[in-house]
Structure formats: structure tokens, C-alpha cells
UniProtKB/Swiss-Prot annotation:
UniProt source species: Photobacterium profundum (strain SS9)
Main location: cytoplasm
Sites where the protein binds Na(+): G157, C160, T163
Ways its activity is controlled: Allosterically activated by HslU binding.
Entry EC no(s): 3.4.25.2
Name of the protein in question: ATP-dependent protease subunit HslV
Oligomeric form and interacting partners: A double ring-shaped homohexamer of HslV is capped on each side by a ring-shaped HslU homohexamer. The assembly of the HslU/HslV complex is dependent on binding of ATP.
Length: 175
């Protein structure tokens, strides 16, 4: 799988992810790009789960963003509705972390849209490790969002065999 982490702090929001693609217990690729900018670079999105499934969801989510003029929550809810009702989409195995200047959301394969507590998202096989690390850093340091995301991904990469140290990091200014 992978690890994706999103941190919002001090006027910045970051989504970061590692680059490992695994097939069973074999590393197939180490430099995949699982974090992207969408909708005229105004929305960040990262995925954990099946790569082909995630690209399908990225495309559909970007279409929803265009339909709803970049409104993050409305686009996420509409994608989740499709995910629940479309027979082909229901079989997709992926989870998305998305953020814009105003908010962050998790969109699950069950069609759920969740606004995280404390503006922290950590998903994927190393998500629990990254979340624990990021929580500790948020509560006990003055580090910025980017540094917290990097450090928590490094810790997840040290522990989780499905997470590596080849990171993609995207950042936006927040309101």
C-alpha cells in the first residue's frame, strides 16, 4: 500500500506521500507520484490503495471539482454518492485525502466523506504510524506543516514495509 499524510498549520496545508508500489510482498516501483494538484492547482489530493483505482478516482474527482467550481466539500460528497451507487466504482479499492485553502477531507471506498479532527489526515498502510508521529509533533513542537508531514512520513517509512522514503510533497497557502 502506501502512506499519505496531510497537515494544516500556520497558514499552510500539505499533503505528502511516499512512492512505493507493491504487488503482494514485492516492491514493483519506488518512485510513484501519489500526491497531485487538481483544479488549477487549487486542490491537493493524495491516494492510498490500488494505483489504477486511484487514478480513476482522481479523474472523477477533478470532474466533480470542475462541475462545482472547485467547491471541495460539494465535489467530495458528489464523488462519494457516485462511488456508492455506481457498480463499477464500488469495486475500486482506494482512499483519497483531499485539501484546499479552506478544508481537508478523507473520501473512503465506502463512499464516506470525513472531515478529520485537528486538521490531520494519515491514510494507508503506514497511516497509523504517521498519524501518531504527526500528532506528537503538532502537540509538542512549533514545526511547520511541511516539516511535520516529512518527519511523520519518515517515521512511517522506517516502520512500515509498504512505505518508502521517496516522498512527493505538495503545499498550499490557507485562509
Amino acid at each position: 500500500m502506501t502512506t499519505i499524510v496531510s497537515v494544516r498549520r500556520n497558514g499552510k496545508v500539505v499533503i505528502a506521500g511516499d512512492g512505493q508500489v507493491s504487488l503482494g510482498n514485492t516492491v514493483m516501483k519506488g518512485n510513484a507520484r501519489k500526491v497531485r494538484r487538481l483544479y488549477n492547482n487549487k486542490v491537493l489530493a493524495g491516494f492510498a490503495g490500488g494505483t489504477a483505482d486511484a487514478f480513476t478516482l482522481f479523474e472523477r474527482f477533478e470532474r466533480k471539482l470542475e462541475m462545482h467550481q472547485g467547491h471541495l466539500l460539494k465535489s467530495a460528497v458528489e464523488l462519494a454518492k457516485d462511488w456508492r451507487t455506481d457498480r463499477a466504482l464500488r469495486k475500486l479499492e482506494a482512499i483519497l485525502a483531499v485539501a484546499d485553502e479552506t478544508g481537508s477531507l478523507i473520501i473512503t471506498g465506502n463512499g464516506d466523506v470525513v472531515q478529520p479532527e485537528n486538521d490531520l489526515i494519515a491514510i494507508g498502510s503506514g497511516g497509523n504510524f504517521a498519524q501518531a508521529a504527526a500528532t506528537a509533533l503538532l502537540e509538542n513542537t512549533d514545526l511547520g506543516a511541511r516539516e511535520i508531514a516529512e518527519k511523520s512520513l519518515n517515521i512511517a517509512g522506517d516502520i512500515c514495509v509498504f512505505t518508502n522514503h521517496n516522498h512527493t510533497i505538495e503545499e498550499l497557502e490557507t485562509k
